[in-house]
Amino acid sequence: MALRVAGLFLKKELVAPATQQLRLLRTGNTTRSQFLANSPNTALDKSILQRYRNLETPANRVQATYLWIDGTGENIRLKDRVLDKVPSSVEDLPDWQYDGSSTYQAHGENSDTTLKPRAIYRDPFKPGKNDVIVLCDTYSADGKPTASNKRAAFQAAIDLISDQEPWFGIEQEYTLLDVDGRPFGWPENGFPAPQGPYYCGVGADRVYARDLVEAHVVACLYAGIDFAGTNAEVMPAQWEFQIGPAGIKACDDLWVSRYILQRIAEEYGVVVTFDPKPMEGQWNGAGAHTNFSTKEMRADGGIKAIEEAIEKLSKRHERHIKAYDPKEGKDNERRLVGRLETSSIDKFSWGVANRAVSVRVPRGVATAGKGYLEDRRPSSNCDPYAVCNAIVRTCLLNE
């Protein structure tokens, strides 16, 4: 469940008048050490594990971490197995079962749920050079996709329009918290200076946890993810990374990059939340802006196809809002409020270089007359399969 405790805890303070918020960031010398001391994970001596990772293991024995999306539609689960050969593709990987009654996906009397491997990545956490991360989708006892398996429907849509070469680039925003739910680096008995100096910022008073962010970049590149970049965001302790452009691989990559981020954060004793509005008041929310294009849009004169797609999106606004967060719009109600660089959840809008609209056309695209559109409505905790499936079915399949 997405963390909102920080927002609830500080709601009264953070809606105070701006004049009361103009105070210097106060961080005690012991804040970070106390912060980490409160995390059970950082209490463990990491050097002990390294002793065992230095042991030689049989070359033909491979550790495979199977990942899947649980019944919440936003959280990742995993379990490990050892394989007897090095897999070269997902076809070499066996299906597996797990207890779906413990992941909100089945009832106890018929709880065996099936994992089907769909994508394979190098594992930055395991010691073996052949160890892998296996992204799976999930199927109930009757063989049908579980309710949280949005990948199956998206794959079916992609199969129908693959000749149009759809690309997706996803901008994943997230917020770092301490284990008590307070944003990382925020003073214990107050709050930072108002937004302004933090976006793409530099300096110890403006940027927090850059080490964690840079570790995430390297781990994702090692894994084979199409990682495009990263930056500090508008709210302190908020960051963004970008995935793509690609087809369904962009969605696979986003889920695996979320997993890698959370695993690295475990080691730092930091909590990652993808909640779209973790802090109440005059603080930016978090989204997953989704950039979309087709072969026609990227060609000369593609702006016409872009505008046609926007027109189709304008007619299916309600459908997209329901698809753009795991609670069918309830999470985005807190974020899409018509201010703080968001549009209104109740009304579709678009414009060139405008960040207060539902769909933005970047100025460079408008100038070039070709490129892509940016759908700014998806929440940071969205399922990218659901988002991209809705876009494809509206814009390309005319559903």
From Swiss-Prot:
GO terms for biological process: glutamine biosynthetic process; L-glutamine biosynthetic process; phagocytosis. Coiled coil: none annotated. Keywords: ATP-binding, Ligase, Mitochondrion, Nucleotide-binding, Transit peptide. Residues 150-399 form the GS catalytic domain. Residues 62-143 form the GS beta-grasp domain. Residues 1-27 form a transit peptide. One of its GO terms (cellular component) is mitochondrion. It catalyses: L-glutamate + NH4(+) + ATP = L-glutamine + ADP + phosphate + H(+). Its EC number is 6.3.1.2. GO terms for molecular function: ATP binding; glutamine synthetase activity. It comes from the Eukaryota. It is found in: Mitochondrion. It is an enzyme of class 6 (ligase). It holds the Pfam family Gln-synt_C. Its main location: mitochondrion. Belongs to the glutamine synthetase family. Homooctamer. This is Glutamine synthetase 1, mitochondrial. The lineage of its organism: Eukaryota, Metazoa, Ecdysozoa, Arthropoda, Hexapoda. The gene is Gs1.
